[in-house]
Amino acid sequence: MKRRACAAAIAAAGLLAGCAWFRPPKKASFWEGRIAIKDPGDPQNNMSASFELQGNASAGSFGLFNMLGLTLASMRWGEGFAELQSGGETHTFKSADAMVRSSLGHSVPLAAVFGWLNGSDANVPGWEVDRSRYAERRLRARKTAASESGVDQAGLELLLVWDAP
């Protein structure tokens, strides 16, 4: 009887210790793949590139590369700074969103992109997200309303295809 009680106590302790070590998987903080932006109002503003995105909306980096792997733009941001390196020049911005706008030529909701890549259902006013192919690591976001500045028109599409982590 004592043996059973002792064995049960050891088994219970083992289970509790096992639970203490279990940690749910963290959301990804690094993605690489392809990005495309389609502007139906001005096809000359369409763009496509490979990308590497790391971090989160508060601090991170975003690199764009041509089909030969050469760097088109390298962006970094953190608390109080946003920096874009492109064409041998470095530019600073007040926000990561302004930096991304300058680099891509379009306003893209950076904070939402991190959420979308992590599978979040985050809704952004003026954007409609198609998550139907998320399991295939494909995402399409479409601008449903023109920006207040008038720079981005409704119909602009952001397409992301990323590799498995």
Describe the residue ranges of each PLM region.
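Bacterial N-terminal signal peptides
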Residues: 11-14
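Bacterial Sec signal peptide processing site at the extreme N-terminus
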Residues: 17-34
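Mature, soluble, non-transmembrane domains
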Residues: 21, 91-96, 101-165
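Short, hydrophobic/aromatic-rich segments at coil-to-beta transitions
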Residues: 28-32, 57-61, 134-141
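Post-signal-peptide N-terminal segment of Sec-exported extracytoplasmic proteins
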Residues: 36-74
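An acidic-aromatic
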Residues: 59-109
